[in-house]
Amino acid sequence: MSFLASPRFLIGLAADQLLPHQCLLCGKFCVDRGVCAACWAGARPISAPLCDRCGRPLPHALPDQLCGQCWRTPPPLAAIRAGFVYNAFSRALILRFKHADGLYLTPVLGQFLARHFAALHQPGNLVVPIPLHRHRYLARRYNQSAELARWLAPVDEFAPAILLRQHHNKSQAGLNRAQRQKNVAGVFTVAPKSRPTLSGRPVILIDDVMTTGATLTAATNCLLAAGSGPVYGLVLARVL
């Protein structure tokens, strides 16, 4: 029996058409699957004008489209894009996604990132999630960044085994910029068997939240040192 003809799929399809949808945040009924209008009012999607390099929103369009920080110290990433500003709205969705068996949120969150992914995507891309250490993976049972990457990427570009986290570093929460950089120093490595696949190819790194950019920077430096092409970052939300 094909999946499309399975009882579970057919029951789910019927329920999707006949039953009212519930908001993923407040649980109230909403017109479509996703977030109701009242909760969506708290969202801060990121859109142009923004810095071409780091993706920070700009107050108005600039001739060179670079923020002051990227003029002074450009990041190693070719570009970074985020779906939302990190606030109460995006925090609630991301925490549910990460810590409450929230894999059912993957399509909704993936759709929020789809336009940014399309803008960054180019032929020959590898789509690489920021990896979890195996201890954290066993505790959570899934890597939320890998699930987003799987949803966004063409099958032949999804590359979850290229980048490895070789040390179980402590959480970045509550650390300042310098502490975050130190905390992720030397954390990542490229799997030796993956180096030929990686060589010269552009990479889109997928993560959930960008605070200072320390994690994306450490991962990017690791990939570039292993011979990748340009590296781009895509996150659900970023702290401003």
Where are these regions (language model features)?
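Glycine-rich phosphate/pyrophosphate-handling loop used in enzymes and phosphotransfer proteins
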Residues: 1-240
